[in-house]
Amino acid sequence: MLRDTHLALQRNWQSLRKPEKLDIEPGADDTRVATIIAEPLERGFGLTLGNALRRVLLSSLHGAAVTSVRIDGVLHEFSSIAGVREDVTDIVLNIKQIAVRMHGDGPKRMTVSATGPCEVTAGMIQTGHDIEVMNPELVICTLDDGATLGMEFTVESGRGYVPAAANRPEDAPIGLIPVDSIYSPVRRVSYRVEPTRVGQVTDYDRLILNIETNGAVTPEDAVALAARILQDQLGMFINFEEPQRLRAEEPRPELPFNPNLLRKVDELELSVRSANCLKNDNIVYIGDLVQKSEQEMLRTPNFGRKSLNEIKEVLSAMGLGLGMVVQDWPPENIEELVKRSDNPF
């Protein structure tokens, strides 16, 4: 009874088709932009997984960001600085866009000093060995001839978006300017779902994720982290234990023939004409097909030499061919063997 219960539980997830292929198509900058394609998925799962992954990618990944800045000679964000074209409000907005990767825990400090005329960029910031600036080309401000500027930044780790007001400590000294912090290393995520085909079945989903990060994490690693977060959050809803003992007691059966013989012919990517001919001849399993001779196949209505060559090529790739003799085919428990072959546990 317990065994039957376990098998009934397992059928809920093991009977669903899982993605067999995950393609990574890098963009112009493969450390920041990529398209990730997962297929095939059961119908409807493309939308389910795509929406969940997108929300987690944008909201839940940890990163690092500037939380406050001190500027020499500046008491508050509504000031202006002699010889600096931007006012402090604009400078703070630019500082918010600095992308950093921090190794270890914060808070950490970064500094920059410059004398005009020049553009002050993020690449001029002096960091320790545990901080990297990911967008050194970012322009923070512009200095006129003879102008000087010194700034000290505080960098911390966190998650999501934190407004400047939350970054102001209660004992903040005069001159400390809090900054809105965008911790998420993921900048943009979009997804779409397209139909894909498995054999003759065309109603499976293909999930296509387009991901752009700030460079602190690659798109491939970002989606892996998002999937792990979802896995961890959903674990609490599982109110039964995995039947590990059952798995040990029921090893994958050893078959007296090539396991591909248990596959159905509609899983083969054959032309519509070839597939219809097999269906009309009541050929269900590859084991049924290989026992047919070439002459028998050519006597099938609408089945020609082109279809014959197509099938021979597909069978050859599996180490099979027409005209084979398979002892005791079909086995009496073929449906059970098919299930165990697809889901060995």
UniProtKB/Swiss-Prot annotation:
Recorded catalytic reaction(s): these are:
RNA(n) + a ribonucleoside 5'-triphosphate = RNA(n+1) + diphosphate
Q: Which is a Pfam family this sequence falls into?
A: RNA_pol_L
Q: Keywords of this protein's UniProt record, alphabetized?
A: DNA-directed RNA polymerase, Nucleotidyltransferase, Transcription, Transferase
What EC identifiers does the entry list?
2.7.7.6
Task: Respond yes or no to whether keyword NAD is given for this record.
Answer: no
Region (Alpha C-terminal domain (alpha-CTD)) location: 257-345
Q: What does this protein do?
A: DNA-dependent RNA polymerase catalyzes the transcription of DNA into RNA using the four ribonucleoside triphosphates as substrates.
Q: Which family does it belong to?
A: Belongs to the RNA polymerase alpha chain family.
Q: What is this protein called?
A: DNA-directed RNA polymerase subunit alpha
The organism is Acidiphilium cryptum (strain JF-5)
